[in-house]
């Protein structure tokens, strides 16, 4: 006989076990989009303790809708090896242009990221950063519904040696530093230019403040670089670059 209270206990106890186990991290990633999940995957494979915090119910960022709701994405030659790493199928459309199914990309990256050892907490919003001695050293979290309803509920803190802002176009985590005058400006993303946007996404993936990295569209927003639309190679390469740099700094 099934008991309702046992079901409840199983969920509550297992969830809070995960939460307690992830209050002290090597890396806290904010945003479970393509660059965030790829960063998490490579970090976990490299031996880092990492969790991703996503304010939405679903993960995957902008992958699902492809271009204008046509659920296909394009990846360029330079990033094809990451599709191979995740065992994602693709077809060559023209030389240097590879098309993949957006649903397969989102679900496969998510699955392999979790299986690599990354814990993803969805419906958890990061509302601030922990900054000590001029260095980002953690995140401040609350339930997304609490933020949506405007209830005055104090948050909790997660400590991390590094934080990655993978929140996309708004660079929402880096905005906390701007708000407090710890960085001078965030110019925002430029107009659409796929070639330059893809190139600069990787170049702009860096530590913008001690302890804080930016990836994906957050990297371009912080640097004022162009957007690129439904081509995702830059997102994947950006996540991998951040992961590799952080692993080196962690000595892993």
Curated annotation (Swiss-Prot):
Binding-site residues, NAD(+): 35, 54-55, 62, 126, 152-154, 217
Residues that hold glycine according to the record: 227
Record-listed Fe cation binding positions: 154, 169
MF terms in GO: iron ion binding; pentosyltransferase activity
GO biological-process terms attached to the record: thiamine biosynthetic process; thiamine diphosphate biosynthetic process; thiazole biosynthetic process
Pathway entry: Cofactor biosynthesis; thiamine diphosphate biosynthesis
Domain of life: Archaea
EC annotation from Swiss-Prot or TrEMBL: 2.4.2.59
InterPro entries attached to this UniProt entry: FAD/NAD-bd_sf, Thi4_fam, Thi4_prok
Pfam families documented for this protein: Thi4
Catalyzed reaction equations: hydrogen sulfide + glycine + NAD(+) = ADP-5-ethyl-4-methylthiazole-2-carboxylate + nicotinamide + 3 H2O + H(+)
Cofactors that this protein relies on: Fe(2+)
SUPFAM superfamilies (alphabetical): FAD/NAD(P)-binding domain
Keyword terms, alphabetized: Iron, Metal-binding, NAD, Thiamine biosynthesis, Transferase
Quaternary structure (record): Homooctamer; tetramer of dimers.
Function of the protein: Involved in the biosynthesis of the thiazole moiety of thiamine. Catalyzes the conversion of NAD and glycine to adenosine diphosphate 5-(2-hydroxyethyl)-4-methylthiazole-2-carboxylate (ADT), an adenylated thiazole intermediate, using free sulfide as a source of sulfur.
Family, as annotated: Belongs to the THI4 family.
Descriptive protein name: Thiamine thiazole synthase
Species: Pyrococcus furiosus (strain ATCC 43587 / DSM 3638 / JCM 8422 / Vc1)
GN (gene name): thi4
